[in-house]
Amino acid sequence: MKRTFQPSTLKRARVHGFRARMATKNGRQVLSRRRAKGRKRLTV
């Protein structure tokens, strides 16, 4: 059985990146919550 985590920077950015977050209303909510919490990194 293969390991399930096969990292790919491109896929990672497309799913969890800043532009992906900005594309949807809920994604923008995620960013604003992380800003309010004071996260150093908003996205990956």
Curated annotation (Swiss-Prot):
Biased composition (Basic residues): 31-44
GO biological process assignments: translation
Any one cellular-component term (Gene Ontology): ribonucleoprotein complex
GO function terms (MF aspect): structural constituent of ribosome
Alphabetized Pfam families for the sequence: Ribosomal_L34 (PF00468)
Region Disordered: start-end pairs: 24-44
Disulfide bond in keyword set: no
Keyword Transmembrane applies: no
Keywords: Ribonucleoprotein, Ribosomal protein
NCBIfam families hit by this protein: rpmH_bact
Family: Belongs to the bacterial ribosomal protein bL34 family.
Protein name as annotated: Large ribosomal subunit protein bL34
Species whose genome carries this gene: Pseudomonas aeruginosa (strain ATCC 15692 / DSM 22644 / CIP 104116 / JCM 14847 / LMG 12228 / 1C / PRS 101 / PAO1)
